[in-house]
Design a protein with these regions (language model features):
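N-terminal cap/lid segment of alpha/beta-hydrolase-fold proteins
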Residues: 1-9
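Conserved HGGG/HGGXW glycine-rich cap/lid loop of the alpha/beta-hydrolase fold
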Residues: 11-65
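Structural signature of beta-strand start/N-cap positions in the alpha/beta core
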Residues: 25, 52, 89-92, 115-116
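Conserved alpha/beta-hydrolase "nucleophile elbow" surrounding the catalytic nucleophile
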Residues: 30-32, 91, 95-97
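Conserved acidic catalytic loop of the alpha/beta-hydrolase fold
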Residues: 74-91
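Flexible "cap/lid" loop of the alpha/beta hydrolase fold
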Residues: 101-144
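Conserved alpha/beta-hydrolase catalytic His-Asp/Glu region
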Residues: 134-189
Length: 192
């Protein structure tokens, strides 16, 4: 699914099903530096369980035009623009890592559209070590390696390694996307 918000092309996956106004919608929000791809299998599962699914590439991520939004608060406001444009309500929001901060902020500001929140690997605070942010700003691939080590220690059990490492590869992805996301997590306001 491709649409425009604020004159920027936005990509979201709907598992090829479209949005049926009679069904409840689950929106999946990716973590720092990632894209809708991380939700591919999950969205297929839930689309087969009679839900609308929507995995959104945030601005500057995946196939969506940039630049990245530099605060969690701006992302929450942007999400409201998306949900208004697509006429979505009674939402189940699922956030992974940074996505958890986004759904918390969204719930604080726009709870009337919500039905449920689901948190995957996140919390209400995500302080990020300044050295990790600096590595990311410099486009250093060690930033991704450290994230995988700290966040996915069991990833050595995956055949071929953790697939997330393959999503964030180029120095541009690291310096222009991951660094902005990590800084946004670090600066996030806490409302609960």
């Amino acid at each position: 699914m491709i649409f425009e918000i604020e004159n920027k092309t936005i990509h979201a996956s709907d598992a090829g099903q479209g949005i049926d106004p009679k069904k409840q919608t689950i929106v999946f929000l990716h973590g720092s530096g990632l894209s809708h791809i991380v939700w591919s299998l999950t969205e297929q599962f839930f689309s087969n369980k009679n839900f609308n699914v929507l995995s959104i590439d945030l601005p500057g991520h995946g196939n969506s035009d940039g630049p990245c939004l530099d605060t969690i608060e701006k992302i929450a406001d942007w999400l409201e623009s998306v949900f208004k444009k697509l006429q979505l309500k009674n939402l189940i929001l699922v956030g992974h890592s940074q996505g958890c901060l986004e759904i918390l902020e969204y719930a604080f500001k726009y709870k009337s559209r919500l039905n449920k929140l689901v948190f995957v690997g996140g919390s209400n605070r995500m302080p990020v070590h300044p050295d990790l942010i600096e590595l990311a700003k410099n486009g250093d691939s060690d930033a991704v390696k450290l994230m995988m080590k700290w966040g996915y220690e069991g990833s050595k059990k995956f055949i071929g390694g953790n697939p997330v490492e393959k999503i964030i590869q180029s120095p541009r992805d690291i310096s222009e996307v991951l660094a902005v996301d990590l800084n946004a997590c670090n600066l996030s306001l806490i409302h609960i």
